[in-house]
């Protein structure tokens, strides 16, 4: 083997290697689909791989393969050029020295350009995949109100926000690193084994002469080191999975304190919160110490192997060098070949800690995806007919276990009717309202009718998304430039905030509970729904403001059907029908 042959064969080598890489990659992916790991992996990635996205990612994957092949090829050429450089120094041949120095300079320029292009294409691939993957995860989470139904699941996946954002992003990055590492390692192993084979001679070990013994000795050394590393680091898989869960739980608890700051302050609950947070943090620290102790053993072993590997090739080739069988350049190329081979064969050993994290993220994403599949397969019985009115025929609701909570309800509401649902706490008022609106997570009985379009459900604490006050009030689909917005704010006693309409802030936290409920009535007046469901939407308001808001919507929207849940007797004057769930009677006022 010589540098001229290797340089001239580079293009042919890249094309041939690309063919085999694509073939082996395809066969490996098909084989992995039959394993537990492969089934989990495919379950995670397949939903985001539509035809258009798949074509783009495959093309970018081919570019990445070419980048990997170029990296390996540059390493091979680099070893031959340095062989020539060091051999020319031993021969005291200055012309040959400068020739190889210039070749190395050109190779350095090519490697710099390659490194820039490689980084760019890898980032493009990861970003494009992440865009598709994230869109799929978010869509599946929001579709069919699964984000809402998950609240009622017994085995709720922990920290869903972390799984969608962090785990998904790091899963993609780690997948690319693993694929790159495996391909690079296999090709490097093949190429530098050939180089090392050509440089090796007879190795005398314990009185035995072994032809090409350097290669066999190095392989035995690296395989032993890899197996030992896997054995030492195996417990890290479970520990890293636990670490992700504990960190997510701790972040969630901190967010809960922030979101419920006012209630905690009124209760003087700081000592209790601090005790709970310290308990969670102690679990994180305990887990971290467990990881540290395992990593001490793994890192100590890896460090020892790495240091032994630095001297090993020189010691193995020293007899041949001092006997004049090989040159100084051959010694240097042997060291390079050994180091590259060592890195390639030790890929899994050196990557083991990251791989344990990868498996943990894979399992967390798989748990999320399978839960989404489970919810998709659930056949929740919600008999519903589209109509211009609201009607219940022998209607009832069941709880999570299938027990009947309410039954045999018959209601008929035409345009302009208003129904007040009252009853003792726990009788199912809000659940009934959700069932009529079509968002009840469990099974219902009988038939419900209401308009398919033009319904608005307003909970006790209206939701305010991030952004300006204008965007928050107009959530989800009111025109932010609505001509009646400012006047409606005045009509609903919220005119003092008109000047802040274009101010970005956390309006959910800034507005008081009563002000948030006024926002709900602004949305009613701007949306003009056919049916509105009010779940104790005036509970934080004084009776005067409550009277003002109900009168306003009744006057402005006389044909609108209203269904209200509330405890106050003052609400009765705004409703012509009443349902008391404690006796299940429909009364005419």
UniProtKB/Swiss-Prot annotation:
It is a multi-pass membrane protein. Keywords: ATP-binding, Cell inner membrane, Cell membrane, Membrane, Nucleotide-binding, Transmembrane, Transmembrane helix, Transport. InterPro entries: AAA+_ATPase (IPR003593), ABC1_TM_dom (IPR011527), ABC1_TM_sf (IPR036640), ABC_transporter-like_ATP-bd (IPR003439), ABC_transporter-like_CS (IPR017871), ABC_transporter_sub-D (IPR050835), P-loop_NTPase (IPR027417). GO terms for cellular component: plasma membrane. Its main location: membrane. GO terms for molecular function: ABC-type transporter activity; ATP binding; ATP hydrolysis activity. It comes from the Bacteria. ATP binds at residues 423-430. Residues 57-357 form the ABC transmembrane type-1 domain. It is found in: Cell inner membrane. Residues 390-587 form the ABC transporter domain. The keyword Transferase does not apply. The chain crosses the membrane at residues 11-31, 57-77, 97-117, 190-210, 213-233. PROSITE patterns: ABC_TM1F, ABC_TRANSPORTER_1, ABC_TRANSPORTER_2. Signal peptide: none annotated. Pfam families: ABC_membrane_2, ABC_tran. Belongs to the ABC transporter superfamily. This is Uncharacterized ABC transporter ATP-binding protein HI_1467.
């Amino acid at each position: 083997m010589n540098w001229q042959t290797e340089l001239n064969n580079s293009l042919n080598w890249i094309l041939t290697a690309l063919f085999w890489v694509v073939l082996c990659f395809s066969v490996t992916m098909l084989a992995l689909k039959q394993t537990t790991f492969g089934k989990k992996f495919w379950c995670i990635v397949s939903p985001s791989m539509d035809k258009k996205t798949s074509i783009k990612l495959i093309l970018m994957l081919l570019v990445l393969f070419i980048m990997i092949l170029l990296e390996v090829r540059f390493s091979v050429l680099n070893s031959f050029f340095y062989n020539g450089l060091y051999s020319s120094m031993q021969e005291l041949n200055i012309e040959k020295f400068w020739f190889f120095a210039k070749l190395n300079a050109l190779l350095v320029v090519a490697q710099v350009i390659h490194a820039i292009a490689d980084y760019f294409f890898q980032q493009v691939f990861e970003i494009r995949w992440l865009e598709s993957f994230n869109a799929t995860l978010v869509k599946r989470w929001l579709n069919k109100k699964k984000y809402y139904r998950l609240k009622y699941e017994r085995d709720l996946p922990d920290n869903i926000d972390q799984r969608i954002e962090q785990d998904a992003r790091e899963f993609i990055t780690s997948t690319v690193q693993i694929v790159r590492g495996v391909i690079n390692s296999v090709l490097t192993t093949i190429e530098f084994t050939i180089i090392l084979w050509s440089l090796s001679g007879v190795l005398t070990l314990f009185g035995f002469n072994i032809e090409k013994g350097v290669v066999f000795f190095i392989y035995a050394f690296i395989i032993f080191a890899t197996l030992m590393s896997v054995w030492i680091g195996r417990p890290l898989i479970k520990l890293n999975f636990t670490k992700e869960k504990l960190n997510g739980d701790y972040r969630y608890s901190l967010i809960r304190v922030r979101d419920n700051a006012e209630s905690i302050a009124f209760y003087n609950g700081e000592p209790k919160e601090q005790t709970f947070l310290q308990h969670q943090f102690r679990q994180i620290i305990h887990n971290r110490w467990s990881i540290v102790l395992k990593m001490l053993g793994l890192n100590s072993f890896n460090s020892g192997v790495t240091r032994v590997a630095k001297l090993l090739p020189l010691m193995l080739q020293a007899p041949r060098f001092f006997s004049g069988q090989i040159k100084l350049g051959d010694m240097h190329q042997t060291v390079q070949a050994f180091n590259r081979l060592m890195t390639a064969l030790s890929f899994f050993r050196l990557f083991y800690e990251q791989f344990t994290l990868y498996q943990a993220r894979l399992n967390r994403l798989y748990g999320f995806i399978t839960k989404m599949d489970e919810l998709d397969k659930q056949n929740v019985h919600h008999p519903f007919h589209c109509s211009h009115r609201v009607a219940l025929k022998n209607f009832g609701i069941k709880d999570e276990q299938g027990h009947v909570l309410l039954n045999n309800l018959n209601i008929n509401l035409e345009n302009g009717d208003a129904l007040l649902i009252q009853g003792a706490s726990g009788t199912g008022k809000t659940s009934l309202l959700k069932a009529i609106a079509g968002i009840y997570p469990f099974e219902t009985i009988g038939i419900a009718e209401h308009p398919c379009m033009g319904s608005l459900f307003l909970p006790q604490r209206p939701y305010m998304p991030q952004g300006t006050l204008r965007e928050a009030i107009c959530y989800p689909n009111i025109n932010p430039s609505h001509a009646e917005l400012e006047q409606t704010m005045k009509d609903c006693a919220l005119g003092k905030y008109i000047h802040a309409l274009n101010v970005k802030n956390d309006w959910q936290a800034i507005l008081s509970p009563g002000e948030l409920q006024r926002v709900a009535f602004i949305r009613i007046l701007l949306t003009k729904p056919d049916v509105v469901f009010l779940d104790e939407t005036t509970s934080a308001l004084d009776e005067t403001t409550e009277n003002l808001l109900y009168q306003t919507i009744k006057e402005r929207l006389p044909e609108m059907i209203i269904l209200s849940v509330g405890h106050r007797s003052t609400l009765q004057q705004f409703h012509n029908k009443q349902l008391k769930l404690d006796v299940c009677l429909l009364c005419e006022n």
